Amino acid sequence: MDVLLTNDDGIDAVGIRALYDALAEVADVTAVAPADDQSAVGRQLSRTVELHDHELGYAVEGTPADCVIAGLGALDLDPDIVVAGCNEGANLGEYVLGRSGTVSAAVEAAFFGVPAIAASVYFPAGDVTIEEFDPDKTDFAEASRAVRYLVDNAIGAGVFDAADYLNVNAPLPPETGHAPMEITEPSHVYEMDGERDGETVRIQDHIWERMAEGTIPDPPGTDRRAVVEGRVSVSPLTAPHPTTGHEGLAGLAEKYQ
């Protein structure tokens, strides 16, 4: 089993190291990851990127999508699967799928026809913000365990016959035992807002505040509900694709002059 490993927190982040070490137990792993933090850049692309040798593989002066394209298109890598992560912070809900650099790396791999897994860890809100939180390798143990299991078994089980990629979100390790795994779908809840102050606008994501309060009405079976309640969420997803049944649009096109 050959794995191309990337992330959006940067190749020296603790999360990618934790995942690299876990995956190395079951696969040959080559990291092709950003040289620095590229969080929340989505599928942003560069025209050219510089590569640097790194003990884990290659550091790329570019985005997560750049890394996947470089790895699959220029570095002669032929992985069985692409893994992105492990992200420092959850990537939950439909609205983050196009924003997250971690998830976007998995989507980029899907367009290459390569199965992919995006992996993130949910850090419950406490006295510090996610920006102030300083995780260590043990915080990624549950996520690493889940991803290693999926990498080792998902292809053989036919998981990617129906899904292009998996979005995996894991809680912090429980005090005893391991978190169970649940197949989920992304939550529909969306609570972005903007607050104007003179010539500036503050962009606010109220989801994180409500997660801390435990007041988000996520129904059973959704990714955020599972993770907040201490389960590993696995959402099987497809890359963007055409839809059908657009009679109304067809009628408009016929009348267009």
From Swiss-Prot:
Protein's UniProt keywords contain Transmembrane: no
Coiled coil: none
Cofactor mode of binding and number, as noted: Binds 1 divalent metal cation per subunit.
GO cellular component: cytoplasm
Residues binding a divalent metal cation: D8, D9, S39, N87
Enzyme class: hydrolase
Compartment(s) of residence: Cytoplasm
EC number(s) recorded for this UniProt protein: 3.1.3.5
UniProt function note: Nucleotidase that shows phosphatase activity on nucleoside 5'-monophosphates.
Family the UniProt entry places it in: Belongs to the SurE nucleotidase family.
Record-given protein name: 5'-nucleotidase SurE
Gene coding for it: surE
